[in-house]
Amino acid sequence: YDEGMRAIALDSTHDGAYHLIGAWHAEVMRLSGFQKFFAKTLFGGGFLDKGNWDDAQKYLARAIALKPQNIFHRLELGEVYVDLGKYSKAREQFTAIEPLPLADVLDHTYKQEAKQILDDIKGEKDET
């Protein structure tokens, strides 16, 4: 977390740093109560209290604004939207992935994941 924030402070246009921070927030929020308890016991865990869904969305959206062709940025934000029951917004991200060119060795896999999740949430209505 600290390194990602430091990277943003040094270069406010570093899309990867914004992705890192947004993904960190999402992963902290996805931890179970037991996992959070274990992490707090083992590592002190004060840093876990920083995690929140709003920042996950904000930082990942900023990564996309900086590099809209990045498939992984869109996949990660779409997954956050699914976690939050914002299926319409998730569909927007997953649908936007399909026409994007492959630029990373994992982009083909990311496209497949997006297509699978899009199929999984077919017919889901927004919860919020």
Where are these regions (language model features)?
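Short coil/linker segments at helix-helix boundaries
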Residues: Y1-T13, I21-R62, L102-T109
